[in-house]
């Protein structure tokens, strides 16, 4: 043993070849600050070995290096800019020393080499990969860019176009694709990886391979003439602007970094990369996107812990073959849980099966599955008009019309056809579980399971614990949701649960703005273009359905009369009365036409202005900032109330529910992260200026207390101790 660190060790192999093995405690290797420092110490040891002829990098884990340790990011980014800059210079000096070793170097990549793991292997002369390997740089998805030389080495190895595509999109590529673009020299079976690596190193040592020739391009300027450079970078910037937009600065800055560094040597280019990395790392967007990653890990970890040893339901059923029922049936069957789809008429059953077939055909067209797999999935959906076989189901999801009497009747009837251990769940979006449970003999086996539309695309499932719901029921439903490929978040019972409860004050704010003379198109524009929602409130209401929103609004008003009841006719009332139900009948706030691809495109409809004139004050211009404040404060206030009442357990779960269920702009990180970025004190001041507009603008007590203490929802992060040259401060 030449060197033993916490997360890597150094050994002699044979004939002057040393191996550096990444071997972190735990199940995966990450390139954290300690590992980087340890790599530096290993290189110190290698520098003292006169007989060194070659170096092999490998992992003793199932994956090479899965990336940097993202749990360190927020504390690293909290460090003063100059300290973070110093640490990156120190870290890059280590990768440069690896790259500059006076002997050939090779990385044997098994499974994942992502982020810092990819940047590490780029510093070696050769790379071999197993067939299952994935190699890439996902940093821009976290609001940052590669910081260990990725923007420098990858373009010089692959050429600008391939590197720009990987870096700007935060992509990883398969071993086969890596071989095509020249990222690896060969793809080798797992059991032959190390022998092949040693053989290749020996060829380099013996002069059969020009290892310095492989290394040289990484140290020099990019091989591009002016016209090639202009075409590559202009195209890349246009693509980034189209896909990432202005709210996500990392991809564009990464492209501009590569462009500016194209004529530089390695060391000059690294200085620019470091400067731009620090700029991004200290941005609100990076904090938000890293926060989402960590919150996602927390939510999924909590679900896994909650399930424990609970078995996944093996047989399911869904009541109702409408849009939601059909979507649930498709998703269950697609993920391997056979499901009975019951309805009272043949027509909806046929529509449900056709919808499933249509979704599967799209997967076939994309090459995601073959005809045999498609047939198997469709065979796992059993359309039925009766309860035959329901006694063998483990879980039944009710997805009939959103009417408490109808739902209660269907649930009670179903309960008489299932076993005593079968779980019943309702896909209600607003009706309290306690209300529906009153009709059941076994309320302990009942809970809410709220899917979002379209089911196959939306990642969130809100699981609602009723007053009598048992822990084992929740565990089984969480297990089923996870098996379906969804992110389950457990909330407590109230009208609207969590997501719809916080959505309707937002819609109420929209109605108030219209009443006060705002143009709904300007509101949509501000909320989409400026704030970053995928749809503004008018467009969202059209997609949800004006009739659905009108009904849900009444449920919410009954549940929370102080805040959500209104004493005036609003735009939703008017459109509902004129049977403008949104996309479902082609007219709502906008008019809809189906394009050649079958997608509905919205168009302006001047008739709406005439309808809304009677319930609105004369037209008045509002700034984007005014619109955003008036729209977002009621939603954030309701999120705060839900946290204070224990409807949702944590800021992390609240934020992920909003991102995954409503499309809350990820670069804001969710309502709690957004509030923390604004500052609770500033937020309360903004809300107080609008308090005259009504109860939805009243800040709850707990949030007022946070403002007085200048606290946020997330704990403040102390700067990382290891940013001073990789050592504990």
Curated annotation (Swiss-Prot):
Active site per the UniProt annotation: 450 (for 3-hydroxyacyl-coa dehydrogenase activity)
Gene Ontology BP terms: fatty acid beta-oxidation
InterPro entries given in the database record: 3-OHacyl-CoA_DH_CS, 3-OHacyl-CoA_DH_NAD-bd, 3HC_DH_C, 6-PGluconate_DH-like_C_sf, ClpP/crotonase-like_dom_sf, Enoyl-CoA_hydra/iso, FA_oxidation_alpha_subunit, FadB
Gene3D superfamilies for the chain: 1.10.1040.50, 2-enoyl-CoA Hydratase, Chain A, domain 1 (3.90.226.10), NAD(P)-binding Rossmann-like Domain (3.40.50.720)
Catalysed reaction equations from the record: a (3S)-3-hydroxyacyl-CoA + NAD(+) = a 3-oxoacyl-CoA + NADH + H(+); a (3S)-3-hydroxyacyl-CoA = a (2E)-enoyl-CoA + H2O; a 4-saturated-(3S)-3-hydroxyacyl-CoA = a (3E)-enoyl-CoA + H2O; (3S)-3-hydroxybutanoyl-CoA = (3R)-3-hydroxybutanoyl-CoA
GO cellular component, one term: fatty acid beta-oxidation multienzyme complex
Full protein name: Fatty acid oxidation complex subunit alpha
Organism: Pectobacterium atrosepticum (strain SCRI 1043 / ATCC BAA-672)
